[in-house]
Amino acid sequence: MKGKSDVMRTLAFAGGDKYVGEWSDGKENGHGTYAFVGGDKYVGDWRDSKRNGRGTQTYSDGGSYVGEWRDDKKHGRGTQTYSDGSSYAGEFRNDKRNGQGTLRWANGDKYVGEWRDNKENGQGTYVFADGDKYVGEVSDRKRNGRGTETYSDGREYVGEWTDGKRNGQGTLSRPNGQNYVGEFKDDLQSGQGTITWPNGQKYVGEFEDDKPNGQGTYSFPGGAKYVGEVKDGFYDGQGIYTSTEGWTQSGLWNRGKFVKADSSPGGNAHQ
């Protein structure tokens, strides 16, 4: 049943806005076009003088929204394009990106996943223009929680993230067969960890700034071993090297070279 005075109306408002469309019960009801004085424009469904249903809004900055509305807010499914060239397709709630959706940036990056209050939050996938890809937990537009990133150079990281960086426990695999398992800090190998090489060599110990630093143990396929202090990956400081033949060098090392034997008897048993 039609409402009272269900007619087409053209209304010009004191502030400069203009409405052309269906009118009933003294309100915008039905289908109509509303031109805002600032340059925005809405074409679509109305109920009780508010945008309700499906409609298209174009903005003065060149952006647009096509989709569902409730009480003058984007609510439901829709597609929004922005003046910077990016676009979002998915769910909205109370005028914000909420739920499942896909955002494509002008530079070619893409995010597919969960949203909360206009931010990437929950489970999602980032696909970057440079070929990198992240799948995992996201909060406040950053990789946070557990996730897997595959890099364009063939590396893969599986583990914990904080504020978009590798932080916590994780595994970094390289295409040459080298693998690191252990702690990370601000994208770098830092803390306790283990590196294995494809030739069977292994290092277990402390890391800092992406390199073995501190106390650690190198072991080699033939049975040789170094136990002691390391710096930037080199034997450096006090340490004991045991060869495959069984002889040892115990003492001070510098940049991988043995420089001084222990003063105690038997400190250097190299024969």
Which sequence ranges carry the predicted segments?
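Aromatic (phenylalanine/tyrosine) cluster motif
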Residues: 13, 34-36, 59, 82, ...
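Terminal, low-structured helical/coil segments at or just beyond the last alpha-helical repeat
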Residues: 257-271
